[in-house]
Design a protein with these regions (language model features):
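Short catalytic-loop micro-motif centered on adjacent basic/acidic residues
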Residues: 9-12, 90
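Catalytic or ion-coupling anion/metal-binding cores of large enzyme and transporter domains
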Residues: 16-20, 26-32, 40-281
Length: 281
């Protein structure tokens, strides 16, 4: 569709799981100036004083219902609170993971990954994205200049640091393939041993995406990961990743993103396995 229309640039609007990588794959193939805008996560719900998030808590309560620990009335009450606003799942599932890795990849404006869908800041991000779409058309800033091997390495580093969805590996490999870039699984396996898990979000941790936003969002993670990042990688701003980090406001005390030297886990949660079922990894 991008190739078929007389477009000078395009805003890619996606949300859940496969929509974001699919849009970026199309943008890579067309190689017309493009910028990603995600819809943003939902806000959390609550049940009997406990915060709820889809899909992590829905599975937990459904298991309790099937085990006879709660009745139909209670599971219905939980269901009514699991998705309290518009947006993608508010845990670090595939949607949130792809939003975060896309910002690290450089195809999204800084701060665009974590802001909840219903917040006024999301509208400001959308407006800024549209303005930047006009600018990249004039500059001729195409996806192949941003989605480079260094940018994909940054995205994979972010995937490990956030404890993100394993689906992202498949998506990133498919995106890279559109640009003739191959994800080196052996290198990724080594990265998994070197990259700490810094983000304490469900389903493996305690917090939700709105908490990550309140903790400063992606730049808080990027700042801690800086020793491992390719900071000279070009981004959609027309500046390097390092310049974007330097331009951000200073961080503040919070408990969602751990310091690099005091991580949740010292190694990433994803490893590459090889064997007769998967000889290529």
């Amino acid at each position: 569709m991008i190739r078929a229309q007389p477009l000078d640039s395009v805003v890619l609007i996606g949300g859940c799981d496969k929509t974001v990588p699919a849009l970026l794959m199309g943008a890579a193939s067309a190689n017309v100036p493009a910028i990603m805008l995600v819809t943003g996560p939902m806000l959390t719900g609550d049940h009997k004083g406990e915060r709820l998030g889809a899909c992590t808590d829905c599975r937990r309560f459904w298991a309790r219902f099937r085990a006879g620990e709660i009745d139909a009335q209670e599971i219905n009450a939980v269901n009514a609170k699991l998705a309290p606003s518009a947006g993608t799942c508010m845990v670090m599932g595939t949607a949130s993971t792809m939003a975060c890795v896309t910002e690290a990849l450089g195809m999204m404006l800084p701060g665009g990954a974590c802001t909840p869908a219903v917040m006024s800041e999301r509208m400001r991000i959308a407006e800024a994205t549209g303005a930047r779409a006009v600018a990249i058309a004039k500059e001729g800033l195409t996806p192949d200049r941003i989605m480079t091997p260094d940018a994909f390495e940054n995205a994979l580093t972010m995937l490990l640091a956030i404890g993100g969805s394993t689906n992202a590996i498949v998506h990133l490999a498919a995106m890279a393939g559109r640009l003739g870039i191959e994800i080196d699984l052996d290198a990724f396996d080594r990265m998994g041993r070197e990259t700490p898990v810094l983000v304490d979000l469900k389903p493996t941790g305690q917090h939700y995406m709105e908490d990550l936003e309140k903790a400063g969002g992606m730049v808080t993670i990027l700042r801690e990961l800086r020793p491992l990042l390719k900071t000279k990688a070009l981004t959609i701003t027309g500046k390097t990743l390092g310049q974007n980090i330097d331009a951000a406001l200073p961080g503040w005390k919070q408990d969602v993103v751990r310091p690099f030297r005091n991580p949740i886990f010292r190694n990433g949660g994803i490893a590459v396995l090889r064997g007769n079922l998967a000889p290529g990894g």
